[in-house]
Amino acid sequence: MSTHLTETWEKAINIIKGELTEVSFNTWIKSINPISLENNSFKLAVPNDFTKGILESRYKDLIVNALKLLTSKKYNIDFIVTTEEKIEENEKNHNNEKSNIVVNDEMSTMLNPKYTFDSFVIGNSNRFAHAASLAVAEAPAKAYNPLFIYGGVGLGKTHLMHAIGHYILHNNPKSQVVYVSSEKFTNELINSIKDDKNVEFRNKYRNIDILLVDDIQFIAGKERTQEEFFHTFNALYEANKQIIISSDRPPKEIPTLEDRLRSRFEWGLIADIQAPDFETRMAILKKKADVEKLNIPNEVMVYIATKIKSNIRELEGALIRIVAFSSLTNKEISVDLASEALKDIISSKQTRQVTIDIIQEVVANYYNLKIEDLKSARRTRNIAFPRQIAMYLSRKLTDMSLPKIGEEFGGRDHTTVIHAYEKISNNLKKDESLQNAINELNKRINQK
């Protein structure tokens, strides 16, 4: 980077600093790095798309005017998103820098460069799934095949799948890695049938080394897709190729999934990801702030981690919302500001927060039982049936895993929870009185 470029930018930001509050300057301007200054073009590196958008809409004119004051020239400002630490290399080879990710063919471009093992925050809620994913990445088709990862929305399943793909490509660039959503797989199958290109479709998915399929639950009920995926699975498995699958639920709970597929999904290892605990939520927020170069007080992160418990996407979204709110209102980031910025999100989440304790209390009252009865070993119908209903509702209305639900009902096995869920689900299709009871219980739970 030239001395002239550095000196020009340092003088410019000193001018800009006098026009902004400290929080706005530190949040938006401090993270900018100059790349090049040529003719009438000034290229500036910014850490992410969100920052780029804010700079373009709110601070671009300020930068242009500061440079004009210094040089008497009006520059065209070009913000370039980059996470590279060496801006000099970016200037020389911007189009080829890929942030230490191997990009060797068409398939690898389907992987998100941000989703690596290094950027994944490990906690008690995801430690097992992370360890299993890393083991598969280190020894494809030798550790666990298939690897089936399940969990709620926004908990990191897709992140781990992309991380596996990146790790394998980094260590073996010649590997044929394919990442696809089940929806895309279905659409490609439909198009291959329509265009009479079945052979090409099968070659694409059966002559590879690694297949990563996201959201497999969406093939449920699609007979032709299940048929094709069954044969694809068999071809890869028999050729000793690695298969990684993700879903929002375990294989046994995917409705209208063919038994032959269900059994194959259970051949390898099933790993679940649960909602992050407080310590993990704090680590996620600190990692996000560090990556995005955001200056967030620790007490604000504690506030976010305390109020938002469901998933990673909402945590990170809350952080960005607070930063944007601070910038747009020219107020320092504080707990009070965070409370104001997140009031809509937090109030709506608090009204719909449902716990197993609440469900047990409502069900016990409805059936004139004690909560201890639902947790007891007694199996008389007047207790066993309400217990099954409570387990069913716990599965439907909370993010708790099957083992956790079983634990809350007297330490029962997760298979007992599955049996209860399936029994109530089946009975609901034909029992009107049960439908009425479930509706009433839902009302009472929502009123809590």
From Swiss-Prot:
Keywords: ATP-binding, Cytoplasm, DNA replication, DNA-binding, Lipid-binding, Nucleotide-binding. Residues 327-448 are annotated as: Domain IV, binds dsDNA. SUPFAM superfamilies: P-loop containing nucleoside triphosphate hydrolases, TrpR-like. Residues 110-326 are annotated as: Domain III, AAA+ region. Gene3D superfamilies: 1.10.1750.10, 1.10.8.60, 3.30.300.180, P-loop containing nucleotide triphosphate hydrolases (3.40.50.300). Residues 73-109 are annotated as: Domain II. ATP binds at G154, G156, K157, T158. It is found in: Cytoplasm. Domain I is involved in oligomerization and binding regulators, domain II is flexibile and of varying length in different bacteria, domain III forms the AAA+ region, while domain IV binds dsDNA. Belongs to the DnaA family. This is Chromosomal replication initiator protein DnaA.
